[in-house]
Amino acid sequence: FADDSAVARKQIQRTLEAMGVKYVATINGREAWEELEKVADYAQASGQAVTELVSLVLTDIEMPEMDGYILTKKVKSDPRFAGVPVIMHSSLSGMSNQQLGKSVGVDEYVPKFEPQRLSETLARRLQRELPAAGQLT
């Protein structure tokens, strides 16, 4: 996942850990893209599909160096990542932000600092059980 906010990263990490999900945390879209390219190269070298190694991409919108819109556009335009959903997780919850996200290929939008909604979205996308109540706070 990509988020430049330390507070948001901690919340996302708690949510993913409560769900037993492995993750790579990055602080901006450029760093996330570099990590995704490494995974794609590894998948190709080992004869695996990227989707065996990357279940989804979770990204903030506003980040330095590369924002979530550009990251999403890169993921969605690269055939190596076909079938990898992108979830936008942001405090910019206006309809114009959501529409711009959809226009670059975002699969879902989850408002920031709503851990229950984030875990429900992730559980559905990852086909996992939800963590017990109280584990997300």
Where are these regions (language model features)?
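Receiver (REC) domain active-site loop signature in two-component systems and cognate sites
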Residues: 63
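Active-site T/S-Asp motif of two-component receiver
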Residues: 59-60
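Alpha4 helix (beta4-alpha4-beta5 surface) of REC/receiver domains from two-component response regulators
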Residues: 70, 92-124
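The C-terminal output helix
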Residues: 123-137
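Acidic catalytic/metal-coordinating carboxylates
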Residues: 28-31, 67-71
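Acidic, metal-coordinating helix/loop segments flanking the phosphotransfer/catalytic sites
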Residues: 25-56
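Charged docking surfaces used in two-component/phosphorelay signaling
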Residues: 10-18
